[in-house]
Structures are given as C-alpha cells and as structure tokens.
C-alpha cells in the first residue's frame, strides 16, 4: 500500500509541476489539472477501501462530477478564447478588459 500511495503522490506532483511549467498555454494547463483530479480520485478511492470508511464512499464520485464540470467549463473557455484570439496562449489575454 505504501508504494501505491507513493505512486499516486508522485503522479499528483508531476501534474502540479506540469501546471507550473506549461502555464502559458491553456490547453496544457487544463490537461495537467485533469491529471491532478484523477490522481486525487484514485487516492481517495484507495484510502476509502484501505481504511474501510464506506460511509464516505460517494466522495470520489462527487470529485469526479466536479472534475467533469471543471473540464467542461475549461474547454468552453478554451474554445471561446481560441475563436476570439486565434490561439490559446494566456499571456496574450487581457483579462481586465471587458
């Protein structure tokens, strides 16, 4: 179980470092955020089954629902930005302008 936890934590940290490294492109950031959410889902599911905490067994599914909503909103924002500006680079956006 220790190796499984270590692998999941390493996957989360790699996705987090991907968010920090590839923050100039919105698509790469969204993919890394999705990797973080999936590693959190696997970690929560493994901990619930390991510690027999079946009273909170719906928490990983709730996390997946919020992850899907986040992905949908992110992709809609990506399509809107790429149609408006022609690319997905974050530094070209002026977010303070209406």
Curated annotation (Swiss-Prot):
Protein name, entry field: NADH-ubiquinone oxidoreductase chain 4L
Biological process according to GO: ATP synthesis coupled electron transport
Family note: Belongs to the complex I subunit 4L family.
Enzyme class: translocase
Pfam families given in the database record: Oxidored_q2
Bilayer topology annotation: Multi-pass membrane protein
Matches recorded under PANTHER family: NADH-UBIQUINONE OXIDOREDUCTASE CHAIN 4L, NADH-UBIQUINONE OXIDOREDUCTASE SUBUNIT ND4L
Catalytic activity: a ubiquinone + NADH + 5 H(+)(in) = a ubiquinol + NAD(+) + 4 H(+)(out)
Compartment list: Mitochondrion membrane
Lineage: Eukaryota, Metazoa, Chordata, Craniata, Vertebrata
Function text: Core subunit of the mitochondrial membrane respiratory chain NADH dehydrogenase (Complex I) which catalyzes electron transfer from NADH through the respiratory chain, using ubiquinone as an electron acceptor. Part of the enzyme membrane arm which is embedded in the lipid bilayer and involved in proton translocation.
Entry GO terms, CC: mitochondrial membrane; respiratory chain complex I
The protein's Enzyme Commission number: 7.1.1.2
Origin: domain of life: Eukaryota
Keywords assigned by UniProt, alphabetized: Electron transport, Membrane, Mitochondrion, NAD, Respiratory chain, Translocase, Transmembrane, Transmembrane helix, Transport, Ubiquinone
Molecular function GO labels: NADH dehydrogenase (ubiquinone) activity
Database matches in Gene3D superfamilies: 1.10.287.3510
Residues that span the membrane, as ranges: 1-21, 36-56, 61-81
